[in-house]
């Protein structure tokens, strides 16, 4: 029951945080008619207040479930929830100051993994950090692909992202590291006995990872258009990787 509930809360969190971020991006002028990505606001499909209210409304069930889990498990889970809430609320402000990648790694890799460890085992297991690294890197790669593509429009909006500060050449190599290193990490952990041999099934995901990396390499010659949907492709890679990785621990 816990696993199903955690999955539902995780899905709700993604929708909520996306709506919250979209609202502030539109209000700040980051998202306009000519920007890439989701156009729910820039197209006029929804009003800004509708998106904001959706995000706030989705926070209510998350808080209720979180408090219920705290009662069932223990106070340490409360601090994980508080940190997660702060990451969600402050994300727009932090991402405009080049901390977006860091917040995503914390909110979508560190906190959920530690939380699940505590809920299922009743304590924080140090070995979960071995899981956090590969999953977190690919998750951050989604944002990095997005920010690399949006450098031009982000400059116009007068915000700062890690992609802007690093520059395109470094962005390319960082993205390649984020999507390829996790597979090397898995192989090393298997060889050292930390993960079961079944974890090598995740290597199936290296094919789309290589394809994504090659797409990013084409950026200097072919321009921003070539990575227009690379964030979506990276999200699919993350889903495939996470599913395969999860299955290997269930076999």
Which functions belong to the PLM regions below?
Residues 1, 63-78, 112-133, 184-198, ...:
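Helix-coil boundary and interhelical linker segments in multi-pass alpha-helical membrane proteins
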Residues 104-157, 169-172:
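Functional transmembrane core segments of multi-pass inner-membrane proteins
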Residues 12, 16-35, 140-163:
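Acidic (Asp/Glu-rich) catalytic motifs at the cytosolic membrane interface
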Residues 2-10, 15:
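Single conserved hydrophobic/aromatic residue that forms the stacking wall/gate
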Residues 194-251:
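Extended hydrophobic alpha-helices typical of membrane-associated regions
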Residues 39-126:
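Intramembrane alpha-helical segments
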Residues 33-72, 162-195, 232-241:
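Multi-pass membrane catalytic core of lipid/isoprenoid biosynthesis enzymes
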Residues 40, 88, 103-118, 135, ...:
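Small-residue-rich segments of transmembrane alpha-helices in multi-pass membrane proteins
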């Amino acid at each position: 029951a816990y696993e199903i509930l955690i999955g539902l809360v995780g899905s709700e969190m993604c929708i909520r945080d996306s709506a919250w971020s979209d609202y502030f991006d539109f209000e700040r002028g980051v998202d306009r008619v000519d920007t890439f990505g989701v156009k729910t606001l820039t197209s006029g499909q929804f009003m800004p207040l509708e998106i904001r209210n959706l995000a706030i409304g989705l926070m209510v069930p998350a808080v209720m479930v979180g408090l219920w889990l705290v009662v069932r498990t223990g106070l340490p889970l409360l601090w994980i929830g508080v940190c997660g809430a702060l990451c969600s609320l402050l994300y727009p402000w932090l991402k405009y100051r080049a901390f977006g990648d860091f917040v995503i790694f914390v909110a979508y890799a560190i906190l959920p993994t530690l939380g699940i460890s505590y809920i299922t085992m009743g304590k924080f297991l140090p070995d979960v950090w071995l899981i956090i690294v590969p999953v977190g890197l690919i998750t951050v790669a989604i944002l990095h692909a997005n920010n690399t593509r949006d450098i031009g429009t982000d400059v116009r909006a007068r915000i700062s992202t890690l992609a802007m500060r690093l520059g395109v050449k470094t962005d390319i190599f960082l993205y390649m590291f984020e999507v390829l290193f996790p597979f090397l990490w898995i192989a090393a952990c298997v060889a050292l006995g930390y993960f079961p041999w079944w974890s090598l099934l995740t290597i199936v995901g290296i094919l789309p990872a290589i394809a994504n990396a090659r797409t990013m390499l084409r950026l200097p010659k072919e321009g921003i258009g070539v990575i227009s949907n690379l964030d979506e492709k990276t999200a699919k890679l993350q889903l495939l990787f996470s599913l395969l990785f999860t299955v290997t621990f269930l076999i």
